[in-house]
């Protein structure tokens, strides 16, 4: 057990080192993710401006939170249905996690932005993982070539994972909390007992959800370092690896989850409240941007740590990464090379 913990700890440290060694990739992911949300933010800003106009309510809203206006705007404006008081400060991530646990559907008006962010993640993560596997510079051509190569593979993997997530978030969640929970607490009058049953059901729901998440991430890593074309094969390989190395896999995941919990706690404490003021607006943008950057760094560090753990579990640590993508020559240049090769062969006869 001690050796497994040391190996997992070393993998986590190496994962963070690889992410820190390519800061430009992390910055590109952050810029792409933030940029993908700008259209939705612009639509919301225009809707707020149209709704307020030059009314006296505008000054009240600018100076702080006006819940009466907020309720009116959320019910009247379609782009504002996701614009609720739960987005203020640290309540935003807490509300997101609470909604996930309770099986709430995401607001329809932000689905487009969410899908765009996920597609950008699928595209850029292939190039980032390829860079972490090689541990050397490949240039812009190599990076975006790897992004293009692995995008469609990760897209197929995402569709397979989506089926599993849909079952866990949909029917399985409904059975636990709409069927099992009422039956288990039908004769319970003590609130603490009902809470313990609900906590147990949350655990039973989170275990398969996290397990699928871990397997899919290890499948991504195996697809990159082994240049796998079949995502079913990558999933099977990931399942085998997780089954054979449960302790180090759990430690790598747990250590990065602990870092994520610390970052979340810091954001909850530092995030400004809903009071107005230019400096508070700047603080919201700065702290929110840093929180997003930290979350993406943690996600990449977990993948890089999983990659390190896989490499060290194979025959040798420096596992062969896929070859650098090479752009083909033009047809004219290829014809010249072929003619030269034919002339060389004829002269040697």
Where are these regions (language model features)?
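Non-cytosolic segments of integral membrane proteins
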Residues: 163, 167-188
């Amino acid at each position: 057990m001690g050796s497994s913990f040391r190996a997992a700890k070393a993998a986590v440290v190496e994962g963070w080192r690889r992410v820190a060694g390519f800061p430009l990739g992390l910055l590109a992911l952050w810029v792409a993710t933030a940029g993908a949300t700008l259209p939705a933010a612009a639509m919301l800003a225009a809707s707020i401006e149209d709704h307020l106009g030059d009314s006296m309510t505008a000054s009240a809203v600018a100076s702080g939170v006006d819940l009466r206006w907020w309720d009116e705007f959320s019910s009247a404006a379609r782009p504002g249905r996701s614009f609720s008081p739960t987005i203020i400060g640290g309540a935003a991530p807490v509300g997101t996690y609470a909604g996930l646990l309770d099986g709430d559907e995401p607001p329809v008006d932000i689905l487009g932005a969410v899908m765009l962010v996920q597609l950008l993640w699928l595209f850029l993560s292939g190039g980032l993982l390829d860079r972490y596997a090689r541990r050397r510079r490949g240039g812009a051509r190599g990076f975006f070539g790897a992004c293009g190569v692995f995008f469609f593979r990760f897209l197929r993997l995402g569709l397979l994972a989506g089926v599993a997530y849909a079952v866990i978030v949909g029917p399985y969640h409904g059975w636990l909390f709409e069927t099992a929970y009422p039956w288990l607490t039908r004769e319970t009058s003590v609130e603490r007992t009902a809470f313990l049953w609900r906590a147990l059901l949350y655990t039973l729901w989170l275990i398969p959800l996290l397990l699928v998440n871990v397997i899919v991430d290890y499948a991504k890593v195996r697809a990159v370092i082994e240049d796998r074309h079949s995502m079913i094969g990558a999933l099977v390989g990931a399942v085998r690896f997780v089954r054979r190395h449960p302790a180090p896999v759990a430690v790598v995941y747990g250590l990065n989850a602990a870092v994520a919990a610390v970052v979340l706690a810091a954001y909850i404490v530092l995030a400004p409240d809903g009071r107005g003021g230019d400096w508070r607006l700047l603080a919201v943008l700065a702290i929110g941007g840093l929180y997003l950057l930290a979350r993406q760094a943690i996600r990449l560090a977990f993948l890089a740590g999983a990659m390190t753990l896989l490499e060290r579990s194979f025959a040798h640590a420096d596992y062969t990464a896929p070859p650098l993508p090479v752009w083909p020559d033009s047809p004219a240049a290829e014809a010249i090379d072929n003619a030269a090769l034919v002339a060389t062969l004829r002269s040697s006869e």
